[in-house]
């Protein structure tokens, strides 16, 4: 049956997922099939790996259907975003925020958005096979009606899809990834702050031993996160400095006419 075939595919996907992970050396959760009731979870994880990208994940049949979106989601219907389908992930991975070890996308994971999703397609499996899944999101940042469509190999890979926002009250010409770049799990945290201890349940309790290959790897990740953070702060400091300089020069220019007026007044009195 279709359900049995889907279950077989899910188990195969989780087996592939587990084969890439070393759970004794990482805070990332192990693969597990979850059976639960209630609204379906969706998450978008911002992943600073070799290249910054976003991972869209939709709960379905106990796992998370997953797509890597290089530029992140767009709420502008005109802006179709490439989404590369990846292996299904375990449900428990959905709320993960922390560090991924070397070997399968080493880097930092930020929980950029999460909430619930509802398929607008009656049969999700059939929609995926057809390559046209319509759904609604209700998250902190992403809401309303969406569609993810397969490109069917037109100049792309077999796993190439497009993530598109439908026109509704939640659409607009805003770059949502720039407008709202920070974590929704750790309030207003960037990558550097995720590593700095604001998420102790994930980062501090799984801190690697100093030295060795693992220590060197984490050192590089931390340095990269800090450079991202300092770059933003540095830009902000420059603008503040410019503002201060212009304010001082304006005050000086304003003071000159006053000084001239005062000297003229003294001359008249004499």
Regions picked out by a protein language model, each given a short descriptive name:
Residues 7-270:
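Catalytic cores of nucleic-acid ligases and guanylyltransferases
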């Amino acid at each position: 049956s279709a359900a049995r075939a889907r279950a077989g595919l899910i188990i195969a996907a989780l087996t592939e997922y587990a084969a890439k992970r070393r759970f004794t050396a990482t805070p990332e959760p192990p693969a597990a099939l979850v059976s639960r009731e209630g609204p379906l979870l969706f998450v978008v994880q911002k992943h600073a790996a070799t290249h910054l990208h976003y991972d869209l994940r939709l709960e379905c049949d106990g796992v998370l259907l997953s797509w890597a979106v290089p530029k992140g989601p767009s709420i502008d219907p005109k802006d179709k975003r490439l989404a590369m389908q990846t292996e299904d992930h375990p449900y428990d991975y959905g709320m993960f925020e922390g560090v991924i070890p070397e070997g399968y996308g080493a880097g930092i994971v930020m929980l950029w958005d999460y909430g619930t999703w509802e398929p607008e397609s009656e049969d999700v499996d059939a929609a995926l096979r057809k390559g046209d899944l319509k759904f609604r999101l209700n998250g902190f940042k992403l809401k309303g009606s969406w569609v993810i469509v397969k490109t069917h190999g037109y100049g792309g890979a077999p796993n190439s899809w497009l993530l598109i926002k439908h026109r509704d009250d939640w659409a607009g010409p805003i770059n949502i990834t720039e407008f709202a770049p920070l974590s929704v799990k750790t309030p207003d945290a960037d990558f550097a702050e995720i590593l700095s201890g604001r998420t102790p349940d994930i980062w501090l309790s799984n801190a690697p031993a100093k030295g060795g290959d693992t220590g060197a790897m984490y050192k590089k990740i931390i340095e990269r996160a800090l450079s991202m953070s300092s770059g933003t702060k540095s830009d902000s400091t420059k603008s503040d400095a410019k503002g201060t300089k212009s304010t001082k020069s304006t005050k000086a220019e304003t003071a000159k006419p006053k000084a001239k007026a005062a000297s003229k007044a003294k001359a008249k009195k004499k």
